[in-house]
Curated annotation (Swiss-Prot):
The keyword Nucleotide-binding applies. It is found in: Cytoplasm. It comes from the Bacteria. Pfam families: Mur_ligase_C (PF02875), Mur_ligase_M (PF08245), MurD-like_N (PF21799). This is UDP-N-acetylmuramoylalanine--D-glutamate ligase. The lineage of its organism: Bacteria, Bacillati, Chloroflexota, Chloroflexia, Chloroflexales. Pathway: Cell wall biogenesis; peptidoglycan biosynthesis. Its EC number is 6.3.2.9. ATP binds at residues 117-123. Its main location: cytoplasm. Belongs to the MurCDEF family. GO terms for biological process: cell division; cell wall organization; peptidoglycan biosynthetic process; regulation of cell shape.
């Protein structure tokens, strides 16, 4: 791809690193780079500082139609919908529309393993990366992780495995470009981002882009516990392409087409495969005693990563070593501290009800739940029922989704004590500390997005951690 001298426009600088990586990459390739973002400079200070000294023009606090008419290539932030009127202007003027990931896929010389899913994708991505690094120490892990993939390109050779976390927003762009990873893995599918996709069907179609453009023989790793993914397997694909995994539910993986599968049988994680001679092999990868991650949902994440690693040819002993060493991911059921007999857990990454339900099911102790926030057009009925069964109290944060959650709690006839909604996070945490009894858990697992009170869910989790650590 020739970029030297091209008029390149980066739409959306952002604060997670992707926009910075794109702008830096384009500038170093000799493109004439303009970065445009609706946010003012003060909101983007860290990103602007990271680009200091590079020949980049910034248009902040607005988008200008003239910039889109003059651009030869527009690289959009995944949060920008493909239907944006500014992108329509650029297309009409003949500009190529790209994203960081479409550029990366076109330029990456190494094999790409992609992971997506409503929940579990970050844990699975990082665990899969750890498994591959046991055998290939130069493995690169990037994607939807606040790590720019383009920044990693100089260190990637034809033999360097690359593990990427891919959101539904990113997959939309990859689908438009006809790009899919060598190995595709979908951890879970449940309602999410319906404010963007509109319908569950459209959301599923976006997730399916991860395998839609694979080559014959490329593996796709699917969850046997998911009726949606079992239905995906009906499409016309060679049976050898299907690799299955199952969590602790004990799904009947043997009835599904395809010879390869990773599943829990009692306390053992089994890899089932067919040799080139046609014989069936069963290998014990690890046991539950090897697992440090909490929660039944993480057993499924381990099985998913194992299935993808085995499909890539990683030896069982390397997988086992990675499982034993892997202690978890920041902002996902992250233990913050214990104070006065109360445990504080940061699960801010639970931005959808399904993820928060999984968090509630992880613990046996009574829970003081901190929930609520911005709406993503998702139902809260199941979340409310789970709260009614497992929480001793719920502390609500202010946001557009919180009235819906309140209505769902009333409909569930939940007898749980309800506090809030709070528009002051410190006040909400002071209440949590006051009402939590020794032996209980204060769990930040909102089931909602963070916008309004926070810049993003990571800001919410960082603030939770800071306030809790300040308690004396």
């Amino acid at each position: 791809m020739h970029l030297n001298g091209k008029r390149a426009l980066v739409m959306g600088l952002g604060v997670h690193g992707g926009g910075v990586g794109v702008a830096r990459f384009l500038a170093l390739q000799g493109a004439e780079v303009t970065v445009t973002d609706l946010r003012p400079p003060d909101d983007l200070r860290a990103s602007l500082d990271a680009l200091a000294g590079l020949p980049i023009r910034f248009v902040l606090g607005e988008h200008r139609e003239a910039d889109f008419r003059q651009a030869e290539i527009v690289v959009r932030n995944p949060a920008v919908p493909p239907t944006s009127r500014y992108l329509q202007i650029a297309r009409a003027a003949g500009a190529a529309i790209e994203m960081e990931m479409t550029l990366f896929f076109r330029l990456c010389p190494g094999p790409i393993l992609g992971v997506t899913g409503t929940k579990g994708k970050t844990t699975t991505t990082l665990l899969l990366g750890a498994m591959l690094r046991e055998q290939f120490p130069d493995t690169v892990v990037a994607g939807n992780l606040r790590i720019s993939a383009l920044d990693q390109l100089p260190s990637i050779s034809a033999t360097t495995p690359v593990v990427l976390e891919l959101s539904s927003f990113v997959l939309e762009g990859l689908g438009e470009a006809g790009l899919s990873p060598k190995i595709a893995c979908i951890t879970t599918i449940a309602p999410d981002h319906l404010d963007r996709h509109g319908t569950m069907e459209a959301y599923i179609q976006a997730k399916e882009e991860i395998w839609r453009h694979q080559r014959p023989g490329d593996p796709v790793v699917l969850c046997a516990d998911s009726p949606i993914m079992r239905a995906m397997a009906v499409v016309d694909r060679r049976p050898g392409d299907m690799v299955w995994f199952a969590g602790a539910k004990g799904s009947d993986v043997y009835r599904l087409k395809g010879d390869r599968r990773a599943f829990w049988r009692g306390d053992e994680l089994i890899w089932h495969d067919r040799s080139t001679e046609g014989s069936i092999t069963h290998t014990v990868i690890c046991t539950r005693d090897d697992v440090r991650l909490p929660g039944a949902h993480n057993l499924a994440n381990i099985a998913a990563a194992t299935a993808a690693a085995c499909a890539f040819g990683i030896a069982p002993e390397h997988i086992r070593r990675a499982v034993r060493a892997f202690a978890g991911v920041e902002h996902r059921l992250e233990f913050v501290r214990e104070l006065d007999g109360v445990c504080y857990i940061n699960d801010t990454a639970a931005t959808a009800p399904e993820a928060a339900i999984a968090a509630l099911r992880t613990f046996d102790a009574p829970i003081v739940l901190i929930a609520g926030g911005a709406d993503k057009n998702l139902p809260f009925d199941a979340f409310a029922r789970e709260i009614a069964q497992r929480a001793s109290a719920v502390i609500l944060l202010q946001g557009s989704a919180t009235p819906k959650l309140l209505d769902a709690l009333r409909a569930a006839r939940a007898s749980v004590a309800i506090h809030g909604p709070y528009d002051d996070f410190e006040q909400a945490l002071d209440t949590a500390r006051r009402i939590a009894a020794p032996g209980e858990i204060v769990l930040l697992s909102p089931g909602c997005a963070s916008f309004g009170m926070f810049r993003n869910e990571f800001h919410r989790g960082d603030t939770f951690r800071r306030i809790v650590q300040s308690f004396t």
